[in-house]
Amino acid sequence: MAPDTRAVLLTLYRYQEAFSALDSNAAHAVWPSVDVKALDRAFDQLEQQTFNLQGCNVTVSGTRADASCSGSAIYARKVGNTAVHEEPRQWRFTLQQRGGQWLIDRVDVR
């Protein structure tokens, strides 16, 4: 595996861990353009959340990269229906290398 591909996958792992920990600051560290206040509000609605990104396909072109991952989101809300839900998800990431590290520019989730 090429070093840049490995570095992109590490960034995606950090994204997964940040969202699983409901940690908006950690999410901002890998996705600088994310709206931290909106993310805090969303995280405040959740009792727990786990993102499972699997089978990520990464394409690196110079200082840009695209990645698509399948997986699931498991979550429970604090209010209302507090049952644990699991939903399949597809993630598409656009990343850019800045200052020697790969950062997320855009995320599309379906």
Model-derived features: positions:
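Compositionally biased, proline/threonine/alanine/serine-rich low-complexity intrinsically disordered stretches
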Residues: M1-P3
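Exposed beta-sheet edge and beta->alpha loop/turn motif
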Residues: R64-R110
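Residue-level detector of alpha-helix boundaries and kinks
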Residues: T11-L12, G80
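Short solvent-exposed beta->alpha transition segments
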Residues: L9-L10, E17-S72
